[in-house]
Regions:
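C-terminal lobe/tail of nucleotide-utilizing enzymes
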Residues: 75-147
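Short glycine-/polar-rich loops that comprise or flank the Walker A/P-loop
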Residues: 52-55, 83-84
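Secondary-structure junction/capping motif
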Residues: 43-44, 113
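ATP-dependent carboxylate-amine ligase catalytic core
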Residues: 1-43, 50, 62-71, 75, ...
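Structural motif
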Residues: 28-30, 57, 88
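Active-site phosphate/pyrophosphate- and oxyanion-stabilizing loops and adjacent acidic/basic residues
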Residues: 46-47, 104
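Short hydrophobic alpha-helical runs that function as membrane-insertion/retention elements
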Residues: 56-59, 116
Length: 147
């Protein structure tokens, strides 16, 4: 919005979400860059999550330094009293933390479940990804069981 010199009306975003939620069993809201991404000057993604009373899943990378980033995000979510379901690891690089160690460390530091990891692939193929998604992510406990 800032680059386009526009002001976003948050009330319209909330109204649109409420309308969508009234007609759909599930509405997935993407975090547009992270929990502290500004939507407007004094309104952040974490404020929107709170105002919409959403549960969250934190998606983290697997590169070195990711635990620091993840913990800063987690601590902010705790400060804002956001409802956190757990974590997903996006292995967007071929190097970095060994996955099982990272998952164990995340659980040990936060006590929250790591639902799985999206593996790194040299050549990304959306059809293959969608087909294999259930092998990567355990969606039990996310609230989709009765849909």
């Amino acid at each position: 919005c800032k680059q386009l010199n526009l002001e976003l009306d948050i009330s319209k975003v909330i109204e649109s979400y409420t309308q969508l939620a009234s007609i759909h069993d599930v509405v997935i809201v993407e975090g547009i860059g992270g929990i502290m991404t500004p939507i407007s000057k004094n309104y952040f993604v974490s404020d929107l999550i709170s105002d919409l009373q959403l549960s969250s899943i934190i998606v983290t990378g697997s590169k070195i330094g990711t635990v620091n980033h993840l913990m800063l995000t987690y601590e902010h979510a705790q400060q804002k009293k956001l409802k956190l379901k757990g974590f997903v690891v996006n292995q967007n690089i071929s190097t970095g933390y060994e996955l099982s160690n990272l998952k164990h460390q995340i659980f040990g530091l936060t006590g929250h479940k790591v639902f799985g990891a999206i593996p790194y692939h040299e050549s990304f193929n959306i059809e293959s990804y969608v087909e294999n998604f259930p092998n990567f992510i355990d969606i039990s406990g996310l609230g989709f069981e009765n849909i």
